[in-house]
């Protein structure tokens, strides 16, 4: 039963009011960027709401006529829900651990187990159904029967079909579609938000399979667009399109962070590593011997080896000031850099100032949505604000500096610094992730590598190792 009458509306509204449902741009555990994020963990601090959710789950089980002997909540959010249900209704409860203890009984399931009895599974949110299925398999190994599961919210992304294929009926208090309908009626969200979420759900349905491995007839999620396909999108920025095409041609999504202090070393790195990279990132304000002639030589090398030049200036002032910093001064950045970046702290004026200079020159800008340093404040609302600003200025903004994919729009590029072949960090707060983690799991497009290459005994060999690792991670994401 998908609803429990008049109580559903107030329940959904109550959960929204405590921010259990969040709308914007969020990167899921899978690396997929989603316009909605559901987090019910906070209800444990709100006893009345916790009891209301638990009562609704139990009533849904009663309405469905399910016969069961024990209850088990999927760890961890559903555990307090199962506890309230069992305590209120005097039902024996079982606890499934996520990992076996290495001491004591070393059991995965705690509680009194009577083989042959039926256990009802409780879950907060179901997407693919994998968490419910994992719990069911653990319980079944203990000799228990699992025929049904109750969930507060079904995201309608194939979980119900997957569980059905394994003999488990899923009963939801509410579907995501119904939740959106209620929130729109209550004017909590607008029609555009509803449309975005529904499109995302329709385009990202998990494929279920029968026990014999044959797929069920539900919609398969479309494969991610390749770099070459994204380069041809009608609304793609010309600079982004050019970059994506050369990435595909050269089979590289590696950006070299050439943070060196001598112009000669900068040019030597550009010439030697140019064939392996799609972009070279500069910090011209640390060059001891900067001249515009040096940048002219760099442009020549960029054309010869087909890579773009990205000045990591991190503009962060009012529009009029950044405009002058971009086009004038000693560095005259706009005259030689294909791309620059900016913080969103000053507001949209920073982008407007930059684009007044950059648009006529066919330049592009990256917004800093996340940073790879410990304690960075570029998270949460800040990141979402960066995404909104990019969408509002897509005629100039081509993407983001971020630790993962922060926007669903394939027109935007994601570049991630703080990458090494092995995860780790330094003593100044920099955090490192591997190419497979950044590209394959978090959905970024380009890795930015500096010390991992420049400090290597053989820079070219190191660059090729990073190039291959990042490209293979990209191919694995495509399923190639």
UniProtKB/Swiss-Prot annotation:
Domain of life where this protein originates: Eukaryota
Residue numbers binding orotidine 5'-phosphate: 257, 281, 314, 317, 321, 372, 430-432, 450-451
EC number(s) per entry: 2.4.2.10, 4.1.1.23
Catalyses which reaction(s): orotidine 5'-phosphate + diphosphate = orotate + 5-phospho-alpha-D-ribose 1-diphosphate; orotidine 5'-phosphate + H(+) = UMP + CO2
Keywords in alphabetical order: Acetylation, Decarboxylase, Glycosyltransferase, Lyase, Multifunctional enzyme, Phosphoprotein, Pyrimidine biosynthesis, Transferase
Residue sites binding UMP per the record: 257, 259, 281-283, 317, 321, 372, 430-432, 450-451
Region (Domain linker): 215-220
A biological process term (GO) from this entry: 'de novo' UMP biosynthetic process
Residues modified to Phosphotyrosine: 37
UniProt-annotated catalytic positions: 314 (for ompdecase activity), 317 (for ompdecase activity)
A molecular function GO annotation: orotidine-5'-phosphate decarboxylase activity
KW Glycosyltransferase (keyword) present: yes
Known pathway: Pyrimidine metabolism; UMP biosynthesis via de novo pathway; UMP from orotate: step 1/2; Pyrimidine metabolism; UMP biosynthesis via de novo pathway; UMP from orotate: step 2/2
UniProt-annotated stretches for the region OPRTase: 2-214
InterPro entries: Aldolase_TIM, OMPdecase, OMPdecase_AS, OMPdeCOase_dom, OPRT, Or_phspho_trans_dom, PRibTrfase_dom, PRTase-like
Modified positions (N-acetylalanine) in chain numbering: 2
Residue positions where Phosphoserine is found in the record: 214
Record family assignment: In the N-terminal section; belongs to the purine/pyrimidine phosphoribosyltransferase family.
Subunit and interaction comment: Homodimer; dimerization is required for enzymatic activity.
NCBIfam families in the record: pyrE, pyrF
UniProt cross-references to PANTHER family, sorted A to Z: OROTATE PHOSPHORIBOSYLTRANSFERASE, URIDINE 5'-MONOPHOSPHATE SYNTHASE
Function comment: Bifunctional enzyme catalyzing the last two steps of de novo pyrimidine biosynthesis, orotate phosphoribosyltransferase (OPRT), which converts orotate to orotidine-5'-monophosphate (OMP), and orotidine-5'-monophosphate decarboxylase (ODC), the terminal enzymatic reaction that decarboxylates OMP to uridine monophosphate (UMP).
Protein name per Swiss-Prot or TrEMBL: Uridine 5'-monophosphate synthase
Source organism per UniProt: Pongo abelii (Sumatran orangutan)
